[in-house]
Amino acid sequence: MDIMTTSKTDTLLDLSLACWDYDRAQAVLDGTIAVPGCRIAAEVHPTSTLFPLAVGEARFDVTEMSMSSYILQVAKGEGAYVAIPVFLSRAFRHNGFVVRADAGIENPKDLEGKRVGVPEYQMTAALWMRGILADEYGVDTDTFQWRTGALEEGTRKDRLTLDLPPHMSVTPIEAGESLQDLLLAGELDAVFAPKPLNALVAGDPRVRRLFPDFAAVERAYHAKTGFFPIMHAIGVRKTIAEANPWLPKALFDAFTQSRDRAMAKLESIWRGSANRLTLPFFHAEMEETRALMGPDFWTYGFAANRAELDAMCRWSQAQHLAPRRVAPEDLFHESMIA
């Protein structure tokens, strides 16, 4: 493609942008907040369809992307994008450990040697879940008999080629199978679920969470580590960022303003006399979150998140994804390292 270049005083730089429809991205997506010097053509895509496009064909100039996939690409010197520290998706993951009720798994160490399903071995949720098991509970996740594939329906496979050591057992499930079905049939002992498993929501007695009081465990994890698990960042096409070095900061500022608008709206609802959200205990949740994490609980920027990013880079190498230990500074455009 031709390298697009302009200055902020010249004609506008046309950019395609894609991400999921987060409240914190809405003002950029709908044009309420402009990116100075740019004309944005925004598209909304679920990450299940967007991430293969980002990795496979780099379709968009600016895109939401998986942090685990990105770390792996940086370690290999691959990929079309350079990141800015806009973390559109963050999620605590203790809630996603789902086990068979009869598998004899009462604590994390009991997972060793078990048959464990995960949609993709390299996905960011799995990176975090393995990292938590290793750091907090001393679990050797290399002993797991990993099965990969669709969580509940459809098909899924790792979007990146992995070079795993021979002692690792990572096997795709068959076409037409799902991890949930295998768990319910007793062919898996546990599943790492990046979303609430349908069988769990339905109250199927064959499955349960490893951490029944997961909210308390997740709050304790944050209190101990300071981490609010980063899932996704924003990537800018390298050729465009190189030709327009002002652009990463302009995008960062726009997404930060968009997040601030979303946070202000949440606060106005919290402080209002009528609850505008269809969520009965929103006020309690908001107060608990602020008490634990402070008023700026969805942080962007490099410095405030460096320790967390360093843990992710360490885990990526330890889990046989990245061939080398990546420094967090190497993940982001140079204008973002502050």
Predicted regions and their residues:
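Immediate post-signal peptide segment of exported/extracytoplasmic ligand-binding proteins
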Residues: 3-16, 105-115, 292-294
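Extracytoplasmic "Venus flytrap"
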Residues: 15-25
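Hydrophobic/proline-rich hinge and linker segments of small-molecule sensing/allosteric domains
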Residues: 17, 90-106, 229-242
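Short, glycine-/small- and polar/acidic-enriched structural segments
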Residues: 23-142, 146-155
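Short helix-initiation/N-cap motifs at beta->coil->alpha
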Residues: 42-53, 106, 144-181, 286, ...
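Pocket-lining segment of extracytoplasmic ligand-binding domains
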Residues: 157-267
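Secondary-structure end/capping motifs
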Residues: 235, 241-318
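Short hairpin/turn module used for nucleic-acid contact or packing/dimerization
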Residues: 307-338
